[in-house]
A protein has these predicted regions:
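Aromatic, loop-rich ligand-recognition surfaces of beta-strand-rich domains
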Residues: 66-129, 144-191
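Solvent-exposed serine/threonine-rich low-complexity stretches and specific carbohydrate-binding patches
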Residues: 127-138
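Compositionally biased, low-complexity repeat tracts
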Residues: 56-59, 95, 138, 150
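Short, compositionally stereotyped local motifs that mark structural "simplifiers"
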Residues: 1-82
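Short intrinsically disordered coil segments
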Residues: 50-54, 131-132, 177-179
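Short glycine-/Asp-/Thr-/Trp-enriched loop segments that recur within the blades
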Residues: 139-143
């Protein structure tokens, strides 16, 4: 291969597609990895609280249909989840989108509600908008990814807090009746 050998982290500062492969003795070993990196107002911004599992929420990489691909963030309990991103400066926001996977067989479903609040000082928050889902919308069969979008109404703020309420236990007619459903998010996108 005539490409340079990368021995340091590859810095990406805008949307682009990274293609990478492993070589030994000039021969490509395995397939080429194609990794689309998306960029938005939340990408690479600090997530407050330093929870290791939440680092994938704004790394610019979307998850696949396998919730085990290390791009999905999940929590030990999905009763109530809350995370805050610091945009580092006041930004105008029109839409907040969060990727959510449903894997019916594993009891992974979207939450009952998603609420977004904003702040200029990380002390006083004001609610902006909320999404709510019925059990019929939550406990759908199949494995699929949904982008759940919230109208931010042109709000200008520095801090954005997302709070979700879990869907609770899987219903009696579910393949996992009585098991607490889990939530998995892949990417927080603020436009």
């Amino acid at each position: 291969a005539a490409s340079p050998l990368y021995e340091q982290p590859l810095l990406v500062k805008e949307a682009q597609t990274v293609n990478a492969a492993t070589f030994a003795d000039g021969q490509q070993m395995g397939k080429t990895l194609t990794l689309p990196v998306h960029w938005n107002k939340a990408t690479a911004k600090p997530l407050l609280g330093n929870k290791v599992n939440e680092a994938v929420l704004n790394n610019g990489v979307r998850g696949s249909l396998k919730q085990t691909d290390f791009e999905w963030c999940s929590w030990g309990s999905s009763d109530r989840i809350s995370f805050t991103v610091d945009l580092l400066q006041k930004e105008k926001m029109n839409t907040l989108t969060i990727g959510c996977i449903t894997n019916y067989g594993m009891g992974v479903h979207k939450p009952k509600s998603i609420r977004v609040a904003v702040s200029d000082d990380n002390a006083t928050y004001r609610d902006i908008n909320e999404l709510e889902y019925t059990p019929e919308e939550i406990f759908r069969e199949g494995t699929f990814i949904e982008d759940l979008s919230i109208d931010m109404r042109g709000t200008v703020a520095r801090y954005v807090r997302v709070t979700t309420e879990g869907a609770g236990e899987c219903p009696a007619d579910h393949v996992r009746p009585g098991q607490e459903s889990r939530v998995c998010f892949d990417e927080l996108i603020i436009e």
